[in-house]
Amino acid sequence: MKICMIGTGYVGLVSGTCFADLGNKVICVDKDKKKIIKLKNSISPIYEPGLDDLIRNNFRAKRLNFTNDLEKAIKESQIIFICVGTPTKKGGSSADLSQIFQVAKEISLSINKFKIIV
């Protein structure tokens, strides 16, 4: 499978790396260019035991890649996971879904054929 993980925080990075370790081709997308450079050098922005080694091994095996090019990642993938932040709104009554809505809009502008979006 060709999988796109949008967001390289805890959920996106750990899940994407594990999908790659299972043999899938995974491209992780993030707007933060500095974070992408670090990830391409096997430097994880989060701590999870064994994650650095999994990133390094799967990146070298070309099963895991990192980019800022959301449009290209969407077009090259069969499955797209939206893994962006949903912080609590002021007052703590609900989640701020604005990042999800923004990514959904960007996906709609880039999608070129049927995709599974999670």
PLM feature spans:
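Structural/interface elements that position substrates and couple domains in central-metabolism enzymes
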Residues: M1-I117
